[in-house]
Curated annotation (Swiss-Prot):
Classification of source organism: Bacteria, Bacillati, Actinomycetota, Actinomycetes, Micromonosporales
Recorded catalytic activity of this chain's protein: (1S,2R)-1-C-(indol-3-yl)glycerol 3-phosphate + L-serine = D-glyceraldehyde 3-phosphate + L-tryptophan + H2O
Name of the protein in question: Tryptophan synthase alpha chain
Biological or metabolic pathway of the protein: Amino-acid biosynthesis; L-tryptophan biosynthesis; L-tryptophan from chorismate: step 5/5
Pfam family, one: Trp_syntA
Entry-linked CDD domains: Tryptophan_synthase_alpha
Active site, renumbered: 49, 60
Subunit and partners: Tetramer of two alpha and two beta chains.
Enzyme Commission number(s) of this protein: 4.2.1.20
Amino acid sequence: MSRIGVAFDQARAEGRAVLVGCMPAGFPTVEGSIAAMTAMVEAGVDVIEVEIPYSDPVMDGPVIQRASDVALAGGVRVADTLRIVEAVAATGAPVVTMTYWNPVEQYGVDAFARDLAAAGGTGLITPDLIPDEAQEWLAASDAYGLDRTFLVSPSSTDARLHMTVEQCRGFVYATTIMGVTGARAQASAAAPVLVSRVRAVTDLPVGVGLGIGTGEQASTASSFADGVIVGSALIRRLLDAPNLPAGLTALRELSAELAAGVRTPAP
């Protein structure tokens, strides 16, 4: 079982969901992103999702786009992301990478899988790659023992959902709000329905994302999902801060609030 699987099992034994915190690699700098992700772990985030910044992020909302633009302007590369993965994995928290597919193709699919595994990464979330076009990635992830997480949404047909989760390993990512990422005032009412649909066809844990930004929302999501995935709300704490130390303080505060939320599932 992967480290992600262990984290989900431990959380399930505690009667709660796993908290997954997301941050772009190299934002605000390479060292700054390592400090940010480490702070998140220290404040109670269970799993870190490191996003490889990309110039055409079709699914990312304005907050993640702004942070990714900062990272790209700073010259961050895939090699920097792997160094960040290695540093954050040293905290003991499982680290999964999220990337659009083009950077992996440019790097080389087999080489990327090899180097991600060597850095201590547990697997990859691929928002714009579907299983029926992922033969090379399926082979590479098998070869290097990496989890692979594909996305399902409320619009997924039953046939598409079944085919997608069949190729997942580690957990399934349920995008519970249609559209781009970003914290919402209210979590999607479609989320519990989508989680139930996924659970009907797989025993894999289900993580919900897109729209969660408060401890209350995390508590609600923890009552029906196995994982609560938060990105934009955490990133905004760094974007809105006057400097990195202030940003890290704000990041710790929100991470602790979210961690408390998943540990007290709503009835």
